[in-house]
């Protein structure tokens, strides 16, 4: 059944964002744009960062960004540049929290290391639980991107999929659309089963132009359900990422790309 309304799990964060953006305006302060918005929750033990700041952190590699979700969720789609660690032992799934000791190994036990956490958005508690455990362990520079994955995607962010995620989606999600970003000659000579070709060479700057417009019109892209999972791969990660970014600009908000070599994806996809 095709979706007929915007998913509530996306509506709720966007409403919260609207409240965050409008509040400064109502009080006479400078108006923020949506990329600069946070939840502005009172009495939080760790500060939040906005989407704009997270993008800057990722570009500059000025902090270690941790995906605070279980590995399988991370493997299927995560913010590019984020890392993931194992779960804290002995904790039930309902109270999932990452292992602080494993985080320590990533940051070489530097308690002053800049750390950013994210999870499944405004209503997800994983980042807050992990932040509190890090503070208890003595870490002093912990921030949260509490808007998380839903708002990252809603604001045009793409995600990255791991080989384990490729295998999972192949087995579990028959609605997923697989986009091959290679040139038509490569696509034809060495195809990936069930993939659709949308070559980067045909992608043009702007909206509704070039090969992307053609793919909308000829059925290669899921125009009647923009919630559909789209996974982009190519000759290499750079090629795949460029096409994924082009699709995200066209309001497809569930777009992931595979950053590894093509043969690794092929192996994962045909297991």
Where are these regions (language model features)?
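Post-signal-peptide N-terminal segment of Sec-exported extracytoplasmic proteins
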Residues: 54-57
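Rhodanese-like catalytic fold shared by cysteine-dependent sulfurtransferases
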Residues: 2, 12, 16-51, 75-117, ...
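Secreted/periplasmic proteins that engage bacterial cell-wall peptidoglycan
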Residues: 69-71
